Amino acid sequence: VLAAGGTLVCHNENLLDQQWHDRPALPPAASWRMPIENAGKSLAEKSADLAAYLDAKDCAAVLLTRVDSVNWLVNMRGGDLPCTPVNLCFALYHCETGLCLLGDQSRLQPVLTPDITVAPLTQLPAMLGDMGDGRLMIEAARLPKRLCERIMASGVHTSAADCPLSIEK
């Protein structure tokens, strides 16, 4: 952009939201679980592997911001994007408290189990405040700017790393 004579400008607001006033709602929820024979491992097995990885990296939790990684971990699929079978959500996995999907509960309801909680993304700062001295692993290069600002403002200790599920997937 700069080489072509353009200018980069940082905006704190989503410019699309400011212009797209008649944006259609998401399609009706169509979440489902992948059968274990297709998924390869259960959520419990994947969670145990993730907890061991985080422990080895001296982290208490990880914020998963890759939609494909969250869907893979939970063995779920959905209809939130045309031609891409995913549920749009992030996840916070804590070694002690388990998995919390950060998204719309009504859309995620079909895949929820007793070992999965769900909260709106707006509750993330409060959840991070409860971490104490535990370190949060984040994939800084893929973290939305607004979310990064909220994490930094929460005072939680962070550890930057690639998504721990990328190789496993």
Regions found by a protein language model. Name each.
Residues Q105-T117:
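Compact, glycine/acidic-enriched structural inserts
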